């Protein structure tokens, strides 16, 4: 449903942000 779609999009966005942050902080890309 719509809620699971939104939840999935939010999760993907959060994971992407965390990956970028980790990349900058640790230098492991």
UniProtKB/Swiss-Prot annotation:
Biological processes annotated in GO: defense response to bacterium
Keyword Secreted among UniProt keywords: yes
Gene Ontology CC annotation, any one: extracellular region
Cysteine pairs bridged by disulfides in the record: 23-29
Name listed for the protein in its UniProt record: Brevinin-2Rb
Signal peptide span: none
Principal location: secreted
Subcellular location: Secreted
Record's keyword annotation contains Disulfide bond: yes
Annotated keywords: Amphibian defense peptide, Antibiotic, Antimicrobial, Disulfide bond, Secreted
Tissue specificity of this protein: Expressed by the skin glands.
Family annotation (InterPro entries): Antimicrobial_frog_2 (IPR012521)
Function per UniProt: Antimicrobial peptide.
Family: Belongs to the frog skin active peptide (FSAP) family. Brevinin subfamily.
Pfam families linked: Antimicrobial_2
């Amino acid at each position: 449903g719509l809620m699971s779609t939104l939840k999935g999009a939010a999760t993907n966005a959060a994971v992407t942000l965390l990956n970028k942050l980790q990349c900058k902080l640790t230098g492991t890309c």
